[in-house]
Amino acid sequence: MKMSALFVIFGLALLFCNSFAAELKATGRGCGGLMDGCDGKSTFCCSGFNCSPTWKWCVYARPGRR
């Protein structure tokens, strides 16, 4: 019983990873979304996000934010 539960959990995790990789490959975005790493030189944030100079990841663009 324990072994079959482990197989189910492992199978679901494998399915999730496979679908995530397929979607990432299909979209092929060249820009970063929320909390994606950026440096402002070679990697950039998508529209609506700014690269945080402190944390080096994309954050929501807000009025008054540098």
From Swiss-Prot:
Cross-referenced InterPro entries: Huwentoxin-1, Huwentoxin_CS1
Keywords carried by this UniProt record: Amidation, Disulfide bond, Ion channel impairing toxin, Knottin, Secreted, Signal, Toxin
Pfam family, any one: Toxin_12
Gene Ontology molecular function: any one: toxin activity
Tissue note: Expressed by the venom gland.
Propeptide feature ranges: 22-29
Modified residues (Proline amide): P63
Keyword Ribosomal protein (UniProt): no
Subcellular location: Secreted
Domain of life: Eukaryota
Keyword Secreted assigned: yes
GO CC aspect terms: extracellular region
SS bond partners: C31-C46, C38-C51, C45-C58
Location, primary (coarse class): secreted
Leader peptide range in chain numbering: 1-21
Role summary: Probable ion channel inhibitor.
Free-text comment on this protein's domains from its UniProt entry: The presence of a 'disulfide through disulfide knot' structurally defines this protein as a knottin.
Family: Belongs to the neurotoxin 10 (Hwtx-1) family. 46 (Jztx-7/10/12) subfamily.
Protein name: U1-theraphotoxin-Cg1d 1
Taxonomic source organism: Chilobrachys guangxiensis (Chinese earth tiger tarantula)
Lineage of source species: Eukaryota, Metazoa, Ecdysozoa, Arthropoda, Chelicerata
